[in-house]
C-alpha cells in the first residue's frame, strides 16, 4: 500500500 498522504503524516518529508 503506497498512499502519498498516509505516510506523509507519519514522516513529514515536506518539512
From Swiss-Prot:
* Recorded catalytic activity of this chain's protein: CO + a quinone + H2O = a quinol + CO2
List required co-factors.
FAD
**Could you tell me which species this protein originates from?**
Pseudomonas carboxydohydrogena
Assembly = Heterotrimer consisting of a large, a medium and a small subunit.
| Cofactor mode of binding and number, as noted | Binds 1 FAD per subunit.
- Give the protein's recorded name: Carbon monoxide dehydrogenase medium chain
**Which EC number(s) does UniProt give?**
1.2.5.3
Name any one GO molecular function. Answer: carbon-monoxide oxygenase activity
Which keywords belong to this entry? FAD, Flavoprotein, Oxidoreductase
Signal peptide positions are none
Q: What is the lineage of its organism?
A: Bacteria, Pseudomonadati, Pseudomonadota, Alphaproteobacteria, Hyphomicrobiales
Query: Any idea what job this protein has?
Result: Catalyzes the oxidation of carbon monoxide to carbon dioxide.
User: Which enzyme class, named as a word?
Assistant: oxidoreductase
